[in-house]
């Protein structure tokens, strides 16, 4: 994997789909350090803008889905970096507490020295008077995903909270399946672990049309609460 990924890696993404029937298409470019788990990108809405909903519901597919950029500690095998040069895919369902539902599929590949992401989105049932469709979301709180192996692929589950006006939070559950394009026999699979993510929309460059985003991510065991039985 070291020969394919550098300390600074550029990436580009295409995200398209519909939310409550509204079609959109976004493109983005950025770079980051895969081994330190940090990345920044700029995303532009090239069709369907300005977005009539909060961009936040797409931002998790931009970066929370950019799994190459995670700093793993405690010797955890890096499933995603091992997957190159072939790459990997993931499928995710996100269920919001107000009834909103979003599905996403992402393909990660390597084109020369550049990571390429292609994302398809389908969002439905977001209430017209809710913070998503009213575009009143504030920020994502930091979140932790639990990650574990099932039949040669990785599964992830997490609870995320979107800060809204008045001190409220809109929560959502994410269920994701990660699939390497390499056979499981060619990979060293990680055990049960946690991945901490912090996603920040740094700037809305043009309202509903252009955003700058940052993420930091760390993969870890439960080291802060050590096991007396020697478990990770």
Swiss-Prot record:
<dbReference type="GO" id="GO:0008218">
    <property type="term" value="P:bioluminescence"/>
</dbReference>
<dbReference type="InterPro" id="IPR011584">
    <property type="entry name" value="GFP-related"/>
</dbReference>
<keyword id="KW-0599">Photoprotein</keyword>
<feature type="modified residue" description="(E)-2,3-didehydrotyrosine">
    <location>
        <position position="64"/>
    </location>
</feature>
<keyword id="KW-0157">Chromophore</keyword>
<dbReference type="InterPro" id="IPR009017">
    <property type="entry name" value="GFP"/>
</dbReference>
<protein>
    <recommendedName>
        <fullName>GFP-like non-fluorescent chromoprotein FP595</fullName>
    </recommendedName>
</protein>
<comment type="similarity">
    <text>Belongs to the GFP family.</text>
</comment>
<feature type="site" description="Cleavage">
    <location>
        <begin position="62"/>
        <end position="63"/>
    </location>
</feature>
<dbReference type="Pfam" id="PF01353">
    <property type="entry name" value="GFP"/>
</dbReference>
<keyword id="KW-0455">Luminescence</keyword>
<comment type="function">
    <text>Pigment protein that is intensely purple in color.</text>
</comment>
<feature type="cross-link" description="2-iminomethyl-5-imidazolinone (Met-Gly)">
    <location>
        <begin position="63"/>
        <end position="65"/>
    </location>
</feature>
